[in-house]
Regions:
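A charged, well-structured terminal subsegment
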Residues: 136-153, 162, 172, 177-181
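Short, glycine-/small-residue-rich phosphate/pyrophosphate-handling segment
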Residues: 92-93, 109-150
Length: 183
């Protein structure tokens, strides 16, 4: 399977990085191909809704690092949305990447991709992840894609917290068993 990870975290060794490392380790054991796009370290211009792209009929006016991501997204079987919780939503870096889906909308919408959400945050409350989950779910409804799993690491200020609470193991198992979940 081809898996694209869209990582919105600006922390190379943070909690989300740990969860993604474990997820990737699981996918490698299962023999899958992974393309990781670390949005915080890429040049991604925000979409300005100029509509020159025609949702995929023409090239986007911004020729930035998204140009390399688009073909990977198109061939992906699974897309992983990963972000630490910032004000109960995804990071601006990840949201900018998702907004730029517009440039190839006609090729993504209705393509039947499977998706996963990986998020971490310090708030341990059940409600803490509702905002990011709702945003994710609405994007999937629009794109007509299907959620196949989530790792929601609540109450994790550090990667050690995520390790101790078993979220790394959960991410690993999700990666290892992704093909079964994607059926």
């Amino acid at each position: 399977m081809n898996i694209v990870i869209l990582n919105g975290s600006p922390h190379k060794k943070g909690t989300n990085a740990y969860l993604l490392d474990e997820f990737i380790r699981g996918t490698e054991v299962a023999g899958h191909q992974v393309y990781r796009f670390d949005a915080a370290f890429k040049k991604v211009h925000p979409c300005i809704a100029c509509d020159r792209c025609g949702c995929g009929d023409n090239p986007c006016v911004f020729q930035d690092d998204m140009v390399a991501l688009w073909p990977e997204l198109e061939k992906a079987d699974v897309v992983v949305f990963a972000s630490p919780l910032y004000y109960y939503s995804a990071t601006a870096q990840l949201l900018s990447v998702v907004a730029r889906f517009y440039a190839i909308d006609k090729r993504l919408k209705g393509s039947g991709k499977k998706t996963i959400l990986v998020s971490s945050g310090t708030n341990p409350s059940d409600w803490a992840m509702l905002g990011i989950q709702r945003n994710y779910e609405e994007a999937l409804m629009y794109l007509e894609w299907t959620d196949i799993g989530r790792v929601l690491a609540r109450g994790c200020k550090t990667r050690e917290d995520a390790e101790e609470k078993g979220f790394g193991k959960q991410a690993y198992e999700l990666g290892k068993n992704i093909e079964e979940r994607a059926k």
